[in-house]
């Protein structure tokens, strides 16, 4: 796992087309913004796991991505 430190307003790049920007920090919550092409799905982990469970994907039951 790559671990990075970013301040509010700073961005990181994932590949050439995905950016993740720190929008704010309040207590233990961090607001981030993600810009990605339409064909790239972006979900919170709990939503992704629910989608995988509905599909019957084995990774969902094991917690593997």
Swiss-Prot record:
- Tell me where in or outside the cell this protein is found: Cytoplasm
What keyword terms does UniProt attach to this protein? Activator, Cytoplasm, Repressor, RNA-binding, Translation regulation
Its BP terms in the Gene Ontology are: mRNA catabolic process; negative regulation of translational initiation; positive regulation of translational initiation; regulation of carbohydrate metabolic process
User: What is one GO cellular-component annotation here?
Assistant: cytosol
**MF terms per GO, please?**
mRNA 5'-UTR binding
Concerning Pfam families, the annotation shows: CsrA
Q: What does this protein do?
A: A key translational regulator that binds mRNA to regulate translation initiation and/or mRNA stability. Mediates global changes in gene expression, shifting from rapid growth to stress survival by linking envelope stress, the stringent response and the catabolite repression systems. Usually binds in the 5'-UTR; binding at or near the Shine-Dalgarno sequence prevents ribosome-binding, repressing translation, binding elsewhere in the 5'-UTR can activate translation and/or stabilize the mRNA. Its function is antagonized by small RNA(s).
Q: Which family does it belong to?
A: Belongs to the CsrA/RsmA family.
Subunit text: Homodimer; the beta-strands of each monomer intercalate to form a hydrophobic core, while the alpha-helices form wings that extend away from the core.
What name goes with this protein? Translational regulator CsrA
Its taxonomic path starts at: Bacteria, Pseudomonadati, Pseudomonadota, Gammaproteobacteria, Vibrionales
